[in-house]
Amino acid sequence: MNTCVIRVYGIVQGVGFRPFVSRVCLDNNIKGSVSNKGSYVEIHAQGDNTDALFDALNHHAPKRSVILEIIKKYADEEPYEDFSIIESEKDEGEIFVSPDIAICDECKEELFNPKDRRYLHPFINCTNCGPRLTILDSMPYDRVRTSMGEFEMCPVCEKEYTSPESRRYDAQPVCCHDCGPEVYTIDLSKDIKEIIELIKNNPKDFRAYSSETGSAAITSARKAIIDGKIVAVKGIGGFHLACDATNEEAVKRLRMLKTRPMKPFAVMMRSMETIEKYCIVNGEQKELLEGPQKPIVLLENKTAGRKDSPLAPSLAPGNPTLGVMLPYAPIQLLLFDYNDSLSMPDALVMTSANASGAPICRTDEDALNEISSFTDIILSNNRKIRLRCDDSVTDFFEGKPYMIRRSRGFAPLPVMISPKVKGSVLAIGGELKNTFCIAKDSLLYPSAYIGDMEDLRSVDALNASVKRMETLLETEPSLVVCDMHPLYHTTEVAESLGLPVVKIQHHYAHILSCMAENNYFDEVIGVSFDGTGYGDDATIWGGEFLKCTPTGYERVGSIEPFIQSGGDASSKEGWRIAASIIRDNCDNGEEICRKLDLCSDTEYTMLAQMASMNINSVRSTSSGRLFDAVSAILGIRKQSTFEGEASTSLMFEAMKYAKETHFEKRDHMSRFSDISITTEGMLATNALAVKIAELFLQGEDRGMLAYAFHDVLSAMIVDKCSTISKITGIKTVALSGGVFQNTLLLRLTKERLNSLGINVLTHSLIPPNDGGIALGQALYGLFYINNK
């Protein structure tokens, strides 16, 4: 019998695709079958209305799906008696793993409906929502290949699972109170070593070491938060540390315990109404906050600096923005609302549960070993997390998401490039904000966020995550790409894998990541601005102009170098860079530093001696450290307690000035007319920093000078790009690197370049910071293999 055979490629597993196909076929009297093949969904359809099926695939597919290609052909097959979903089978080809999906509106409604059988069930899900990547063992996506495989469905759940009219038809994690995982608390007043020993001896029996289960556990966690305590909560991709975001003492205590004096905490708010009460939210931001990913979104805090703000001042000290998200897992919704008569606050701190620099805790044992000293009670569950996954964090630029950390909800969605390349490559990524990327032909799969590799627990997490993703993607890389820094842990990891290793320059990888995201492979002028990267000349780079293709680059400019003295301390203490620049560019440097209160005379002399004797000193073109220096000069931040603190504070000062003065005209530019744009082919950034210092000592406004620094630096960048463009004929500029998280500098630079008729590539869903360089490394590896 004539049979229409359809293959659908894309995100079609874990999103209710097979049930959708089954319903369409039943409605249109189409007989046949649908199955997962691992890399695609295959449909065999017999009947007069197969056009209706094809139309539904093109126009009415499940909203969580992403269809990249549909291939249709006809074959002669035996007649089918009905339409069925058949057992998944593996086949070679492209693989698409669905990210975890936030709870849908229908499940949320059922969760709080007393008449529903899943009323207050902490693991409610359906074909449209729930865990995917974090519970997956291997493809195709079926229950037996997930951590839900150990939970046998009850008859009622199984009926829903097998009924085409049910929203839970073929929903792999489906469960209920009778057959699903359970929540429980761990009492931390007991000896931690004894509890860990109980876990090791009873890995499948949480009752051996838990104190309360079910509703009692949830109520205990809620009461602890109300009482000002800190609760570790196991979510979809790991544990969070939660406390009352309106309780200043609780927030300050969490800061003290985590040794995190200033870095902002993420806040989970009860509802969109709550967010709008505290923050300014536009339409695009609201759509993302309420969408299936539900990331942390950076929003302007209406109450920042207000003494009458209900929110704790210590949430984000000195920061006009808040990182805000909505509850995306049922257990988080139940923390806000439960049938126990307790009244919860509308906002909770919800920060990753990890020791500083380490990956997010995934198991009970992780939590007990690493964060038991940070928390008063652990609210856990017995659904195993296979792959840890932090919350994604995003800003907005030009009405689109501008990713800071790409993880839950987005990873491991692939970046598809147009060149038809072949091969499998593993890119290890950066030392900080590590993610890795696996390239399989023209699909590049960036991983979820791992952490900073200076912590060996992050190195272990990287190795484990790489192995799991290779299993999920069913690929064995033939090449490893890593950063060229000889002392990075990522270099060690790459060299330990027993595969050929290619090392590429850090800032070149940044530009390649921007090119890959934009699917642009002609030659570009790359402006790669960040904190640090190992240069070809063994100095520190970070303010680079590169002429780039996917197969190579040429350094064609940089900011003016300075001496960075003090090793790791110089990356946290901007006053050192400021003093160095002033010393080497002013006759009366010591006096200027004294007047600016940058450092003592003794410290000034010590830095000068270190530089002259080449002790722990290196030549640097780091634009990140330049921002730190100007922040110190203006008395905003002399040192940073977390990466980017000083430079971000400088941006906030500039934005505050622009907002308060409705700044339009660039009349401040005249104050800088006596400094060159470039010096010996490099941006005259040292002269700019010195001029900022001179004007500040003359009494010029701090905010104006902060804004002027951004504006003049932007003009310098654009002038350099224009010069390179005229010489080379290249009309496209790619802007990447962590400094371009600064949306003020990004906007000023992009506007100026566009006004000159220059095309500008920027990031959106791939971070401009080191969390994105693995994508660039993977792109280079693919072209390397295909051009050998």
What are these regions, as identified by a protein language model?
Residues 1-173, 177, 184:
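Intrinsically disordered, low-complexity, mixed-charge
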Residues 60, 145, 160, 168, ...:
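Internal gly/pro-rich beta-alpha loop/helix module
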Residues 173, 180-182, 430-468, 580-730, ...:
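A contiguous, well-structured pocket-lining segment that forms one wall/lid of small-molecule binding clefts
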Residues 230, 238-303:
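A phosphate-binding glycine/aspartate-rich beta-alpha loop in the early core of alpha/beta enzymes
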Residues 232, 474-486, 728-739:
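Short glycine-rich phosphate-binding loop at a beta-alpha junction
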Residues 276-281, 334, 360-365, 391-392, ...:
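Conserved phosphate-binding catalytic cores of ATP/NTP-utilizing and phosphoryl-transfer enzymes
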Residues 483, 498-510, 732-736, 743, ...:
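Conserved phosphate-binding/catalytic loops in two-lobed NTP-binding clefts
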Residues 507-529, 533-535, 574-583, 710, ...:
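Glycine-rich phosphate-binding/hydrolytic loop that grips phosphoryl groups
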